[in-house]
């Protein structure tokens, strides 16, 4: 099983890349995290936010593995605890197949793409920088895995 993070945006600061890499490398080989960056569309006078999101959605869908479980990150998504994420991770491992977490661009995710997602989740009620979301998601996936393994990283 592979955990894939598909994120709109590229050319992140080095500290974002280092933070993401730190948590990604901690994952076991059978549950590795891969990042696929999607080039953001430029908004101009003739391109509305809706148009930009549609164009980005097409790129996102092209980056998704066939048959994967898509989980979209959205400010109106389900608020999970880390323990609930760990329970979900265990269930996904038992079901098999790849999991793709989708992080939208500056305007968010296209509504049609969100409708295709199996689940909408949010990391916080706060508005977060998109680069930071990558790091936080990777950390939470590592923490969820550590809970399933009784690893001392997560302390109650």
Swiss-Prot record:
The keyword Transferase applies. Its main location: cytoplasm. One of its GO terms (cellular component) is cytoplasm. Its EC number is 2.1.1.177. The keyword Methyltransferase applies. It is found in: Cytoplasm. GO terms for molecular function: rRNA (pseudouridine-N3-)-methyltransferase activity. S-adenosyl-L-methionine binds at residues 73, 104, 123-128. It catalyses: pseudouridine(1915) in 23S rRNA + S-adenosyl-L-methionine = N(3)-methylpseudouridine(1915) in 23S rRNA + S-adenosyl-L-homocysteine + H(+). InterPro entries: Alpha/beta_knot_MTases, RlmH-like, tRNA_m1G_MTases_N. Keywords: Cytoplasm, Methyltransferase, rRNA processing, S-adenosyl-L-methionine, Transferase. SUPFAM superfamilies: alpha/beta knot. Belongs to the RNA methyltransferase RlmH family. Homodimer. Specifically methylates the pseudouridine at position 1915 (m3Psi1915) in 23S rRNA. This is Ribosomal RNA large subunit methyltransferase H. The gene is rlmH.
